[in-house]
Structure formats: structure tokens, C-alpha cells
């Protein structure tokens, strides 16, 4: 009896403690989740708005190995062969790809990028700069940030045009989306535009962007390298018009495959757009392979770049088979012989 009393008391006390803890947890677990950053909080903040645009840049094409991770794109051509038979890049060599299984199917990616760009364009003017506008000692910073917002808006328009072109390049005429769409609406009856409509939209956007953006990205500092510029907009226009001039990108419903016409005026427009880029006088072929990758992004060939962290992936994927070497890309003799 003496031993049972403390045990029973202990059980009762533990039960009371558990009830107390559970009742206390109720309030704790029911707390409102207040760390979510909504649209209002994003686009009234200069810093958060800047990050939102950076997120749109993430949808630009990845680098040389964007298909198959380890494979350079040349492995899908006659220039090279990838050593790994199961690598996705091999689908292009074997013909084992179709509309349902396409290693380069980027429909979802680029429309996601277009949505982000549209949302940015619609909201960037909401950024609150009163902290600097109302401070006489911060007028220079106020003007800098005001200019940033204008520049960013046209960078987003460039990205939207770029993403549309990437879709047109792969799928032909696609719906041109210039506003943020509701997820609840029915878009099944959305008409497919003509190729000329798509090309006209992208080309026109490039012209408007080129009127605003400078030849140097952002404020001209190293951290801005990779942002859209006037040169990038004109170069995109040149590329778009070049594709548009090809008989392969005509509106096929009006022509048979055996009788595809060639529109000389479109070729002239493409040539003039390319000359407009050349006449900027800031781009040229780089003369030395030895120093091509050694100048910290200062390269006369770069028009639009996507920056990556310092690593040895390129070497690792292409070193001969050994410890730390994959031996992935094997060039053809034809490619070797094409060099002088």
C-alpha cells in the first residue's frame, strides 16, 4: 500500500501535466502564419521587386549541357558523340523522341517565365520610394532607384519577348500572353495566332526595349553583367527575323511542303537587323582561344550571358575516362579536320 500511493500520485500528476501541455499547444498550433510575403509586400519593396525580376532571369536557357546534364549540345549533331548511351541527348541521335517524349520540351518552363515577367510588368510601378524621395540628402539615390525601376520594366519586356521566341522556335505560332492570366478561366478556345503575328509582337517588343535600355547592363557594375541591354534586344530581333525569313517558319496552312516560297523582303529585314547590331560597334569575334575564358566576363563576343558559379564541371564531364573524368564528349574526326 505504501508503494502504490506514490505511483498512483505520479500517474495523476503526469496526466494533469499532459492535459496542461495539450491545452497550451492548442493556442500555439493555432497561431496565424505571418511570415508569408504576398504580392503587396513584394511590389512595394524595392529590394523584393529586384529579386522578383532576378527570378524571371532564371528562366533563360541553361548552358551548354542543358539536355542530359553532362552532355554538350554538339552531342546531338554529327560533331560529337556522348559516351553514355542512356544520356537524354542520345534520343536525338537514335530518333527515340516524339511530341510526348521530347528532351527539349520547354513549353511549361517558358510560359512560367512569361507569367513571372507579366506579373512584374504589371506591378513594378507600385514600388514605394518615399524614403528617398522625401529625403533631401538622398535625391541621387532616389533618381538611381527610379531609373532602375524603369530599366527593370523593359528588361522584363525583353525576357517576355525572349521566352515567346523560344516557344515559337520549337512549336511554331503560339498564344501571345501579355497579361497575368487567372488560373480559374477556361482557355481551351484560345485561338492560335499566325506566325506573322508572333514575329511582329516579338520584333516590336525588341524595338521598344532597345529605345530604353543602354548598351551597358544596369548601372554598369560587374554584378549587373547578364542583364538585358540594347544590344541584346537588337540581337534578339535579328535572330527572330532570321527565323521568320526561313520557309520552314511560314504559315504552313497556306503552302504545300513541296512549294514553300522564299520571301526576299523578309531576308532583307533579317540582314538589316543583323547590321544594326554590328553597327553598334561593341561586339566582335574574340581572337584567342587561350584567353577566351580568362577575362572575367569581359569578352567582346558576349551579347547576353547567363552567369554560373566557378566550378570544374566542364572539365570533369570531358576529361578522358579516369578518376574524376567522365570522358563524355567525343568529337568526330570531321570536326577535327574542319580546323585549319
Q: What are the residue ranges of the model-derived segments?
A:
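C-terminal motif of bacterial Sec signal peptides marking the signal peptidase cleavage site
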Residues: 22-24
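Bacterial N-terminal signal peptides
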Residues: 12-20
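Short coil/linker segments at helix-helix boundaries
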Residues: 131-146, 173-192, 248-268
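Conserved, well-structured interaction surfaces
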Residues: 50, 54-62, 84-171, 187-200, ...
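Alpha-solenoid helical repeat scaffolds
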Residues: 127, 166, 170-173, 179, ...
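An aromatic- and glycine-enriched ligand-binding surface/loop that stacks and positions planar moieties
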Residues: 26-88, 174, 199, 227-340
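Second-shell loop/turn segments in exported
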Residues: 37-43, 99-107, 185-193, 224, ...
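Bacterial N-terminal signal peptides that target proteins for export
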Residues: 2-12
